[in-house]
Amino acid sequence: MGLLVFVRNLLLALCLFLVLGFLYYSAWKLHLLQWEEDSNSVVLSFDSAGQTLGSEYDRLGFLLNLDSKLPAELATKYANFSEGACKPGYASALMTAIFPRFSKPAPMFLDDSFRKWARIREFVPPFGIKGQDNLIKAILSVTKEYRLTPALDSLRCRRCIIVGNGGVLANKSLGSRIDDYDIVVRLNSAPVKGFEKDVGSKTTLRITYPEGAMQRPEQYERDSLFVLAGFKWQDFKWLKYIVYKERVSASDGFWKSVATRVPKEPPEIRILNPYFIQEAAFTLIGLPFNNGLMGRGNIPTLGSVAVTMALHGCDEVAVAGFGYDMSTPNAPLHYYETVRMAAIKESWTHNIQREKEFLRKLVKARVITDLSSGI
């Protein structure tokens, strides 16, 4: 009798397991289906609560008729804030108003619970962490810091600016305005020294990947956090070398020479949550899904990724140095070098036009502020 009860309970447990597994798999497939639609087809859009959006929204879920005026409820909410005062929740509130699918909660950096994050677990880099568990675990076991600095974490309201590398920054004298922000994010190896008048002198985060990292240790700002954006598995391997101060091999799958040393102690190093790359690419910009793999024209630029990160982690968001003007092919591409605008047309991975459309939506709806007016 006892054996029959045991077998019955075992079968019930097995059935329950199979049902739950089927439901989980079905939900996952439905979730992927929304991204796998052809980029030219109509995509059903839902808000963050799963409700279908109406015809007043575009295929991605953005409001079609964007207005620079604040929605009435937000105008009332922020009416009593003085000019220049930081407005808590401002960027995310406006983002949700024009894009109801937006859901703010998302950690800025990977922490020791990263393997529990379903949104990134099933995707390989750059859209997730699949296959990178051991490397990431080894890195985090040494860095042991997963947040902003305590001083920044304690702020009731955070004003952030993403400083792009665009030539539009030259001769704008925006340096002092940039330095007024609580968090100043810089990208790749864009220099500060010698350009302070236009780009400021403050750096809070420097987000990069191995090929984009500064190669001379003296170029790094002393008080900034070094943040890896992992676009391929070799990037995580490179960061492990850096954190453990091991020798970096130049032949480890990089498309150009990389830094062999980063003058930062492990607690000053972070790994960007790859969800922001995934969200920017497929949800906000609408790049081809390509089965969740890196492919032609489906990788967002680091600038758009940083903006996406800021929408989740900051109360107010601004940009400077953004925007490519393809009508002026001989204009400088970056503020610090002589490479011309035409070079960006040769990009295999980016879709500059789609990104421009995304950023223009944010500027028009006042979700972000464009200090250099390049977007």
From Swiss-Prot:
Q: Which GO terms describe its biological process?
A: ganglioside biosynthetic process via lactosylceramide; glycosphingolipid biosynthetic process; keratan sulfate proteoglycan biosynthetic process; O-glycan processing; oligosaccharide biosynthetic process; protein glycosylation; viral protein processing
Q: Which residues lie toward the Lumenal compartment?
A: 29-375
Q: Which InterPro entries match?
A: Glyco_trans_29, Glycosyltransferase_29, GT29-like_sf, Sialyl_trans
Protein's pathway: Protein modification; protein glycosylation
Query: What Pfam families does its record include?
Result: Glyco_transf_29
EC main group: transferase
Q: List where the protein spans the membrane.
A: 9-28
The protein's topology relative to the membrane is: Single-pass type II membrane protein
Q: What is the effect of changing A13D?
A: In MRT12; most of the mutant protein is improperly localized to the endoplasmic reticulum preventing the protein from interacting with its substrates in the Golgi and resulting in a loss-of-function
Keywords of this protein's UniProt record, alphabetized? Answer: Disease variant, Disulfide bond, Epilepsy, Glycoprotein, Glycosyltransferase, Golgi apparatus, Intellectual disability, Membrane, Secreted, Signal-anchor, Transferase, Transmembrane, Transmembrane helix
Glycosylation sites recorded in the entry for this protein? N80, N171
Gene3D superfamilies cross-referenced by the UniProt entry: Glycosyl transferase family 29
One annotated GO molecular function is: sialyltransferase activity
Residue intervals annotated with topology Cytoplasmic: 1-8
Taken from the UniProt record, the cysteine pairs bridged by disulfide bonds within this chain are C160-C314
Where expressed (tissue)? Highly expressed in adult skeletal muscle and in all fetal tissues examined and to a much lesser extent in placenta, lung and liver.
Subcellular location as annotated = Golgi apparatus, Golgi stack membrane; Secreted
Q: How is it modified after translation?
A: The soluble form derives from the membrane form by proteolytic processing.
UniProt disease link: Intellectual developmental disorder, autosomal recessive 12: A disorder characterized by significantly below average general intellectual functioning associated with impairments in adaptive behavior and manifested during the developmental period. Developmental and epileptic encephalopathy 15: A form of epilepsy that manifests in the neonatal or the early infantile period as severely impaired cognitive and motor development, due to recurrent clinical seizures or prominent interictal epileptiform discharges. Patients develop infantile spasms, mainly of the flexor type, between 3 and 7 months of age, which are accompanied by hypsarrhythmia on EEG. Other features include poor eye contact, hypotonia, primitive reflexes, and irritability. Seizures evolve clinically to Lennox-Gastaut syndrome.
Q: Which family does it belong to?
A: Belongs to the glycosyltransferase 29 family.
Q: What does this protein do?
A: Catalyzes the formation of the NeuAc-alpha-2,3-Gal-beta-1,4-GlcNAc-, NeuAc-alpha-2,3-Gal-beta-1,3-GlcNAc- and NeuAc-alpha-2,3-Gal-beta-1,3-GalNAc- sequences found in terminal carbohydrate groups of glycoproteins and glycolipids. The highest activity is toward Gal-beta-1,3-GlcNAc and the lowest toward Gal-beta-1,3-GalNAc.
What is this protein identified as? CMP-N-acetylneuraminate-beta-1,4-galactoside alpha-2,3-sialyltransferase
Q: Which organism is it from?
A: Homo sapiens (Human)
